[in-house]
Amino acid sequence: RDRSPSRGLGDVYKRQHQLYEPHKFEGKNITRGFERILWGFFKKMILADWAAVFVDAIFDNPDQYSGLAIFGVLFYTVQLYADFSGGMDVVIGIASMFGIELDENFKRPFFSISITDFWHRWHITLGTWMKDYVFYPVTLSKWMGKFGKWGKKVFGKKTGRTLPICLANLIVFFVVGVWHGAAWKYIVYGMYNGIIIAFSGLMAEHYRNWKKKFNITGKENWYHVFMIIRTFILVNISWFFDRADTVGQAFHMMKLSVTKFAPSQLLLIPAGKEGTA
């Protein structure tokens, strides 16, 4: 059997055996699948399209709507999630009607407590593909083994064991950036995520020591909420690079988010896409 990677197949490859198994139409599958399809279309055609009106207006005219930069990226979060997860809802719903079960591709990503956790919940099939065909091959390669040995000699055993994983994550998210598109903004988007994950890995022991010092177990409700909000902010910063036309525009809009804030400008955005530039 050919096990070469395919960017386009994703979860379908692992589930293709279901295509050759006998299935029969069942009322509960039809009902469940139809409900999932309707929910998907609602997210794509209502929520995503509604959010896109504000996203396009703000990102296409950042100086005209300078006080709305932060709203632009928040609406983009709604647009992305509703569009991507809505599409998967339709696919999963159709498959369900035929008795084929597909894995969920989004699992409450905005309740993540870290960037690593976010990527375990967001676009899961992409993350699985990257893990199987990029992360593991890189981590288990001979040159990475040599790099790990060098790291242990220079930085000690603990850091030396972590360095190969950090480097592998950087490579993975470089590929994630290129996967999104052949432009610098996508590479910066990918590396932004990779650097945060790599840095978190290097700092993991320090984080544990700090939590112990301040008597934080990690189970406190306030701490959990703090981690969710922190991660949500970090994720939204990355969206600036994903949606802006250039890296420069992304940084410009980040600056506007801090220096200017005028929610009243939302009233100036035309109600339809035809009114946006």
What kind of feature is each model-predicted range?
Residues 1, 6-276:
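Membrane-embedded transmembrane alpha-helical bundles that form the catalytic cores
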